[in-house]
Each structure stands twice: as structure tokens, then as C-alpha cells.
Regions:
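Non-catalytic, solvent-exposed segments at the cell envelope interface
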Residues: 2-247
């Protein structure tokens, strides 16, 4: 059989070499993507460890809850309640607290509540308002005051006012809207211990349990006084009743 000298001969190793080259390319791309993903997460405001102190300060023992409940004449539910504290700040000043919303997901009763806490008030026996302690101590100041009032916090999300509005709109429209609004939500988040998937999961669970912008529960305040004058106070037991840790 005649073989043309100008046509290259096929090598038995040619396919093996090609496969090896492709494998190297895929591995290189995978390593690059992994590296970029790691860098993005390291510098991300989501899944941040900067809020670890705030969450650690929000731990409440069953005994503390029982003491507050006994003093108020109510009963601890014993339910497993996951509380996410959404600290809302001014769009133009992240150091100014303009709102505090607690999303309480009761896994035992399979229900949820969204509780709005007045930031110009003090919780329980606190000596300063929530807005004041945020200005001086950040998120930890707020969670510490809540914990002192027997209100545990599992997660903390600091958002701007526009970010909170986007979150509520998306949560009310369902899971698909949450995914579509990812960019708007991310832009409105200042800091969160939850990563993107965790935040999405909270939104979906809250929405499926019936939480919406129309279902926000307000906590009543009462006027109290000390040596410095009068102030507004949130009763710890009333707040616990609202989130479901007491009944």
C-alpha cells in the first residue's frame, strides 16, 4: 500500500497525549476556580467570623429563661427556636441603627414569627437603649442586651434599610424571587455570619412559614424611669412570648 510522504502518520500515543493535555487543562481550571472562590469567601461580608463575639454574647441558658418566665408568671415552651437578628442600619451611615427585627423560626411547632423591636427602648433591666448600645458596641451590644433579657440569638445579619426592604420583598415572593434578587440583597448586606446559602435557607424557611412584610409583630413598650429621667422599656417576657420561647 502506497503511503504519501506529505501526510503525517497517526501515532498510537497521540490519543493518550491529547487526553493527558485535556486532563491537565481541566485540573488547572478547577484549581483556579477553587482559588478564586476561596479568595471571594475570605473577603466576603457573608459567612463572616467578625460577628462571632456578638453571637457568643447571645447565648442564654434554660435556667435564665426559666427565671424570667417565673417572674412574669409565664412558662418556658422548651421549643427549639432559631432566632436571626436583623440589625438594620441607615443607608448612608452603617453605624446608625434604624431598626431591629427578629426572625424566630420555631422548629418544634413548625411556625415562625417576625418581631420588630423598638430601638429607642431598653430591653428588660438594661441601662441604655438598643440604638445607643449599637452605636457604642456594635452588634455585640445589641445581642448582649437581648441575651440579658433571656432572648437568645442564633445568627446576626447587619443590613442597610434598602437591603432589608429587598429582603422582605423577596421573602414575600418566594424562593425564586430570593434567587433573582441575590445581587440586590448582597449589596444591602453589611455583615452576616450566615453565608449565601444559609441566608437563602433562612429566607425560604421564613417565607414557607408565612412570614411576610404584612406579618410583622410589634412589641409593646412601657414608660419607666431612673435617676436620669424617663425612658421606654420592652418587657423581656413579652419579647420572649413574641418569639416563642415562652407561653
Amino acid at each position: 500500500m502506497y503511503e504519501r510522504p506529505d501526510v503525517p502518520k497517526l501515532s498510537a500515543n497521540r490519543n493518550v497525549i491529547a487526553a493527558a493535555v485535556i486532563a491537565v487543562v481541566f485540573v488547572s481550571v478547577a484549581l483556579l476556580v477553587t482559588h478564586l472562590w476561596r479568595l471571594a469567601n475570605e473577603h466576603s461580608k457573608l459567612g463572616s467570623s467578625k460577628l462571632s463575639d456578638a453571637i457568643a454574647a447571645a447565648t442564654v441558658s434554660p435556667d435564665a429563661i426559666a427565671q424570667v418566665a417565673e417572674a412574669a408568671g409565664v412558662t418556658p415552651t422548651g421549643d427549639t427556636v432559631e432566632v436571626v437578628a436583623f440589625l438594620v442600619t441607615a443607608d448612608d451611615d452603617e453605624k446608625t441603627l434604624t431598626g431591629l427585627n427578629l426572625a424566630a423560626i420555631d422548629d418544634t411547632q413548625e411556625k415562625a414569627a417576625l418581631v420588630s423591636v423598638p430601638i429607642d427602648a431598653r430591653v428588660g433591666t438594661a441601662t441604655a437603649s438598643l440604638a445607643s448600645v449599637y452605636a457604642s458596641g456594635g452588634a455585640k451590644g445589641v445581642t448582649s442586651q437581648l441575651a440579658a433579657g433571656a432572648v437568645p440569638v442564633s445568627h446576626v445579619v447587619v443590613m442597610t434599610e434598602s437591603g432589608w426592604g429587598a429582603f422582605m420583598e423577596a421573602a414575600q415572593s418566594g424562593a425564586s424571587a430570593l434567587k433573582r434578587s441575590a445581587t440586590r440583597l448582597l449589596d444591602g448586606i453589611v455583615l452576616s455570619d450566615l453565608d449565601a446559602q444559609g441566608l437563602l435557607d433562612i429566607g425560604q424557611r421564613a417565607a414557607s412559614a408565612g412570614i411576610s412584610a404584612d406579618s410583622v409583630v410589634g412589641v409593646p413598650t412601657a414608660e419607666a424611669s431612673d435617676a436620669a429621667g424617663t425612658y421606654q422599656q420592652v418587657d423581656s417576657a413579652q419579647l420572649a412570648l413574641a418569639i416563642g420561647t415562652m407561653a
